[in-house]
Amino acid sequence: MIQAQIDLHGLVSDEARSYVSSFIGDCKKRGIRCVRIVHGKGLGSRNREPVLKNKLRSWLIQKDEVIAYAQAKKQDGGAGAVIVLLKN
């Protein structure tokens, strides 16, 4: 069950990275374990390529608080979102 979410639409890479880090830290403090991070499909970016989608996956790998992540189901955002499981 998704307990919290953030939406990175409209953010540049550095802003998004900082926002994700703060969000994950806050969720950890609050005991939240399952979150959705909406990064978008990249349709509004230059060359219509997903910039944040690929960077987000790289950032999540580096976070000790993250156990696992996967692309969201279609009804939860599909290719435009990631579901993240955080440590207790």
Sequence positions of predicted segments:
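Long, charged, low-complexity intrinsically disordered regions
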Residues: M1-C34, V38-N88
